[in-house]
Amino acid sequence: MRWALLALAIPGASQSALADAPRLGPFELPKPRELTVFRNDEAFNPYEALNGSFTSPETCAAVPDGLWVEAEGKGDCIRYYPQALADGGNPTVLVYFGGDVMLRNAKGVRFITDSYIRQSPATIGAEMAEWAKKAGHPVIFMARPGIYGSSGNHNNRRHTREIALMDGALDQIRQKYNISSFILTGHSAGGQIVASLMNRRKDVSAAVITSGLVSVKQVSAFWERRRKIPGKLLYNAAEFYDPITEIERISTDPRPDIYVISDPEGRVVPFFSQLFYVRRLRAAGFEPHHIYAQATDRQRHLLAYHGRLAAALIAQGRSEVEIRRAVHEMDLEQFK
């Protein structure tokens, strides 16, 4: 039951917005402002998540666990939330990438989920501390551009630059903490980040993707046909980075251990797109483990804690059978 209650705190758990929360019309341009440095229990601001933020290397130096990362000729301050990292060296570190916090309604209006507004550095720190204790290894929450204290524009998600910023941040973190390998975990659009980083890096020993946006253009086409305003009028999906197109770039020496966890009844990221990714991995000679799970939210989407559990067990050296059993036991516990 405890895991089920924790799942309610995951950003994206609610697809509603507070009545007085800011919104952007389908064709309205965002109005970015100077990055706010959130500390302790200060709740993240929906305005910056919706409109974006900017800062300088000098200001970034004062951001707790902030990294100045440059990509495509522009820099952003990328914030991360570490737990249990040692000074001398860290053989294996678990890293989590969350999903989107900005949603669109049927008319294309953008808003920030109310669950995001309830989050703060303190709540993230508490979740990471618990994950580190469960795994017995250091962990990190990576704040994607424009959200959770990182500068940037969350409207520009899915693009290559977002991937490059996350890649550059991991490079700096690896060097700073003397990390040998990463176990990457990504939920929903965070799954796109993880799949994309596997295409770029050779230090990913394992990856866990839950309800993952891993076939980006396929899913974009699916949703474009279901909005009142065609998606192609709101964004150019051809510019999105689709990790499924470069699966052959995943390292084969060493070969990462890949887990994909899906709810076949998922209504946010269609199950068929995740199945397609798994089949493409197998066709390329990889051996992904595809686990079916049951999310308890109305959209049958929230499997982030299933993914964190699987990653913790991978870090402990558990077998595939043990991991599958633990994920299914979590399913059963949710309904007690």
Predicted features along the sequence, with ranges:
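N-terminal cap/lid segment of alpha/beta-hydrolase-fold proteins
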Residues: 38-88
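Short, surface-exposed "cap/lid" segments of acyl-processing enzymes
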Residues: 73-137
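Alpha/beta-hydrolase active-site loop
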Residues: 152-177
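Gly/Ala-rich beta-loop-alpha elbow adjacent to hydrolase catalytic centers
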Residues: 185-194
